[in-house]
Amino acid sequence: MPKAKTHSGASKRFRRTGTGKIVRQKANRRHLLEHKPSTRTRRLDGRTVVAANDTKRVTSLLNG
C-alpha cells in the first residue's frame, strides 16, 4: 500500500508543538484591520491550541 499523503492545505495551517499539541493562527487578522479595535487585533495575535474536538480530524490530515 502506498504512503498516505499529508493534506497540503492542513500542513500550511497547522503545526505540531514539541509536546504534541496542534496549534493554529487565529482568524480575522489578515486584512481590513483599520476599523478593528487595537484590543481585538492584540487578542487575535499569536497562535492558539486547536480545540480537543478537532484534534483527531486535524491529526488525520497531518498523517499523525
From Swiss-Prot:
Pfam families: Ribosomal_L35p. Residues 1-22 are annotated as: Disordered. Keywords: Ribonucleoprotein, Ribosomal protein. It comes from the Bacteria. The keyword Lipoprotein does not apply. The keyword NAD does not apply. One of its GO terms (molecular function) is structural constituent of ribosome. GO terms for biological process: translation. GO terms for cellular component: cytosolic large ribosomal subunit. NCBIfam families: rpmI_bact. Belongs to the bacterial ribosomal protein bL35 family. This is Large ribosomal subunit protein bL35. The lineage of its organism: Bacteria, Bacillati, Actinomycetota, Actinomycetes, Mycobacteriales.
